Regions:
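N-terminal loops that bind phosphate or other acidic moieties
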Residues: 1-339
Length: 339
């Protein structure tokens, strides 16, 4: 038996009805396949918060200016941001990675490509070479974390304007209209939402990103931190590390990674169904069904780390002593179709 088959065998011998922990069981089996062992262990885990700024902020697509990206990154480094507080519940270490903030922040991991992207409503957000460089930096980040002993990585992001970039990418990759999937991000007004839709439509009309070339989409309307997350998802497959998907920005990065390398999907764990409208379509495209439906849209990886306490509880049962053999009774057998 391979690792996944061994993990399923283990679940079938835990003293409970078959498949009664539902998607949690499926995730544990998936992690066994990623880690290539049925002795699933995710005790050492981290959240990588990818930070970057966006030139499209100049179009009035966000309530805040780019200076807020650096302020939140400072809070992450200091351990006081929302993600730090939520991650502490599950013993998750948090790192901020600078893929391209306008203002560098001491204490972040340096993955910088440039001081923010260009305004995609006027010109391509970045060059293809820059996109490739950021993706590689994300892959390298997974390698570094694996070398430090981390067994699982949650993704997150911080970048004012990045829901605009990620929605533009989703429109291109899914061949749909900004009218259909553009959300309010961090609480835009009606006027702000219209500016956001207009900026996305303008970028798509000017640059014609190629839906069949994910790197082209990423370079023309993406962001450095989004590209970094694409690399993290690709790195998960390469280095046998489970990677948790967060909200809409992370989901777009996951979709982009799958378009680049379809096999990378096997190392991705969906966490929650964000209330951003694009997420439903992306998860459908990926064939994924997130466990948590809490209308979260905070970002920073907060949705991703919310999955960890649930996984920890499932693994307590998976590794626990409460088995049919221990109790001296026969295991349940599938009854579907039996008289």
């Amino acid at each position: 038996m391979n690792a996944q088959e061994q993990a399923q065998f283990r679940w079938n011998h835990v003293a409970k009805p078959l498949n009664s922990l539902g998607k949690l069981e499926q995730l544990v089996v998936q992690i066994a396949g990623i880690q290539q062992t049925a002795d699933v262990c995710i005790n050492k885990r981290c959240a990588l918060i990818c930070c970057g700024d966006h030139g499209v902020v100049a179009e009035g697509v966000s309530q805040s200016g780019s200076e807020v990206t650096a302020l939140v990154a400072q809070s992450i480094v200091a351990g006081t941001a929302n993600i730090n507080l939520m991650a502490s519940v599950s013993g998750t270490d948090v790192y901020a990675l600078d893929f391209g903030m306008v203002t560098p922040v001491a204490g972040t991991i340096d993955c910088r490509i440039a001081a923010g992207t260009r305004n995609m409503a006027r010109e391509p957000a970045m060059t293809r070479a820059q996109a490739e460089q950021a993706v590689q930096a994300g892959i390298d980040a997974v390698a570094r974390m694996k070398a430090r002993g981390y067994q699982l990585i949650a993704t997150g992001e911080m970048g004012i304007g990045n829901t605009t970039a990620s929605t533009a990418m989703a429109c291109a990759l899914l061949r749909c209209s900004p009218e259909d999937i553009t959300g309010r991000g961090a609480g835009l007004s009606d006027a702000g939402l219209q500016r956001k839709k207009a900026a996305i439509q303008r970028a798509l009309s000017i640059h014609h990103p190629d839906a069949d070339d994910a790197l082209d989409v990423l370079a023309k309307v993406g962001g450095f931190e989004i590209a970094g997350m694409v690399g993290i998802f690709l790195g998960g497959l390469r280095h046998h590390v489970p990677i948790i998907i967060d909200g809409v920005i992370s989901a777009v990065a996951a979709l982009t990674a799958v378009r680049i390398d379809p096999a990378s999907k096997s190392a991705m764990l969906p966490a929650h169904m964000s209330h951003e409208p694009a997420v439903v379509r992306i998860m459908s495209e990926l064939g994924m069904s997130p466990i948590i439906h809490a209308d979260m849209a905070l970002g920073e990886g907060t949705g991703a780390v919310s999955l960890l306490p649930l996984l920890d509880m499932a693994l307590k049962v998976y590794h626990g002593p409460h088995t049919f053999d221990e109790l001296g009774i026969s295991a349940y057998e599938p009854q579907e179709g039996k008289a």
